[in-house]
């Protein structure tokens, strides 16, 4: 935790050198942020508290209708396993269907709406939505709720106050399960998501993704 401000400063000051990996389609970035624009300058910045549904809408995470479709094995091949495409309705063009990944038969779909309700329920509706977004072409989604408490770094020195967040994230390609973490990192891109997950000592997960 003590190294967090220096690491975050490096990310924000040198962000132009790193890929944010936010999903962007038709000039629209799937990202929303409360009051503060992120270093990449993408997405929607809002100034008033939003409901869970409103947050999903702002970040282009609503109505994906994530679903499975059987992947047929070519007739000249044999396999004792069944695989499926993970599909979604494109968030900016509902006439288009996107492939998010290929998973095994034990994979269970989670809608973005269910992920965000999961986070909302952890705090019993007591948090405020801070950021939300989609990265890696929709394969990974995240949301962060601001908590009331603050962490004080170096209380006998500079006494910096660092906000904390409840981070929720999952994948739609079977790469990671549903996770909930408490972190001082304000997640706005792939880099800050990785930083939050790598510096969080304890993560609560729901085993959802099976290849």
Please report, for each region that a protein language model flagged, where it lies by residue.
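Short, positively charged and aromatic/hydrophobic N-terminal segments
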Residues: 4-9
């Amino acid at each position: 935790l003590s190294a967090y401000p220096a690491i975050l400063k490096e990310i924000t000051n040198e962000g132009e050198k790193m890929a944010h990996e936010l999903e962007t389609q038709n000039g629209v970035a799937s990202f929303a942020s409360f009051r503060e624009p992120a270093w990449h300058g993408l997405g929607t910045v809002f100034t008033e508290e939003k409901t869970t549904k409103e947050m999903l809408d702002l970040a282009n995470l609503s109505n994906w209708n994530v679903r499975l479709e059987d992947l047929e094995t070519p007739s000249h091949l044999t396999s004792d396993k069944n695989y499926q495409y993970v599909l979604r309705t494109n968030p900016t063009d509902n006439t288009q269907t996107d492939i998010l990944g290929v998973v095994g038969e034990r994979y269970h779909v989670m809608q973005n709406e269910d992920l965000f309700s999961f986070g909302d329920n952890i705090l019993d509706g007591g948090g405020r939505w801070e950021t939300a977004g989609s990265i890696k072409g929709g394969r990974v989604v995240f949301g962060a709720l601001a908590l009331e408490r603050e962490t004080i770094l170096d209380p006998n020195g500079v006494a910096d106050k660092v906000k904390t967040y409840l981070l929720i994230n999952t994948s739609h390609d079977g790469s990671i399960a549903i996770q909930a973490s408490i972190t001082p990192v304000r997640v706005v891109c792939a880099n800050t998501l990785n930083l939050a997950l790598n510096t969080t000592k304890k993560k609560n997960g729901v085993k959802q993704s099976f290849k």
